[in-house]
Amino acid sequence: IDQVQQIIDLPYKQNARNGGQPVFNLAKDLFILSFAMMGMNSADFYNAPTAENEIITYQRTKTRTRREDKAEMKVRIEPEIKSLFEKYSDPSGEKVFIFHKWYRSSENFNKSINKGLDEIGKIIEVPDLNYYYARHTMATLAANKAGIDIARVDEMLNHSDSTLKLARVYIERDYSVLWEANR
């Protein structure tokens, strides 16, 4: 929780030399958005086609071709992140977010985010900070701090494995619960 708060509290950097936004700022914002939007992947921010009534509906890029339900997900835009949502909305309405106009591919978009997160990681002393840290942290805090059932966390991550094996990979084990149970 402390590291997420540190990222939220980091001041923005001034505009880049070319008048664009520094990747530091983009990385900070996308980390916050991913964390607050159930670990939404950068490729899904890049490709998300629609938002209606403050709900983004998308098919998870990574797994849509492998699942019968096309890995469809609906994520609500919570009031705490509405300003970030609006900041990056595509004014043309072609897609939910404008990133597809700023970057040639979702891979380039992800590289920029991770470049900014590397810089942020050095500041907050989290070596190798990357975009997936937001997804993992969301899952860990949901299960270990908010007490959300692991099956629900698995759904939040848009996993379809009934054994919850993937959720267990994402969620850092909280030994304090075991120690307390052992007392």
What are these regions (language model features)?
Residues 1-4, 78-126:
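Active-site/catalytic core of tyrosine-dependent DNA strand-transfer enzymes
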Residues 16-21, 61-74, 100-109, 126-130, ...:
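Short, contiguous acidic/charged loop-to-helix segments that flank catalytic cores in large enzymes
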Residues 50-57, 127-128, 147-169:
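Short, polar N-cap/turn motifs at the start of nucleic acid-interacting alpha helices
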Residues 60-65, 157-183:
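Catalytic-site neighborhood detector that most strongly recognizes the C-terminal catalytic loop/helix
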